[in-house]
Amino acid sequence: MERKHIITISGKPGSGKSSTADKVAELLGYTRYSSGDMVRNILAREHMTLAEYNEKANDDHALDTKIDEYLRGLRTKKDVIIDSRLGFYWLPESFKVYLDLDMQVATVRIYKDAVSNNMRTKSGEVASSLDAVSKQVRERMENERRRFKEMYNVDPYNIEHFDLVIDTSRHTPQTVALTVYDHYRQWLKTDTWKQVRSSIPLGYSFKNQY
């Protein structure tokens, strides 16, 4: 069976999905797509915060449906990286990557990002203290679990859906991207694949030269 040259990257908030997707796309020479970018464009156009978007999406699924249609349209593409919460669901034939991390690490990353990025602070994407950020992240995850369970009967945070699970808590996007690259090249060469839960060694680099 010929593998699709598509990688979908999902994971927890703060796990480095966008940064990793950018670097994997660069390594492979692939085109990157992001549902997160689409959401941010909607927020800017509608003058909404992320919190307002999530609240509205609980009752109005039109926004989610628009993003899902966009993702389904990417199935005809090749040589692409897709950073999306439900990419694995809409493109099940892709190499499905999940980026995990400790929630305390996620909280600190998101808080630091907010402090250094005034635009995102104004958007309401994050709150003003570590405790508030932690609460917001957990509420966001539970909201998405509930919403997507209702819409598609799928939990986007269930790691059993994925081919490769990486804990990014202690590693840079570059290191994580190299790990994705390495396993993806192995995945392309085989018809069968058992989920890999990767604990990246410190100082990781390419295992093989391609």
Predicted features along the sequence, with ranges:
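Walker A/P-loop
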Residues: 18
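ATP-dependent small-molecule kinase phosphotransfer cores
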Residues: 35-92, 104, 112-125, 131, ...
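Small-molecule kinase domains that catalyze NTP-dependent phosphoryl transfer to phosphate-bearing small molecules
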Residues: 121-176, 193, 197-210
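Post-Walker A helix-loop "phosphate-sensing" segment adjacent to the P-loop in P-loop NTPases
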Residues: 26-33
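ATP-binding Walker
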Residues: 15
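P-loop (Walker A) phosphate-binding loop of NTP-binding proteins
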Residues: 12
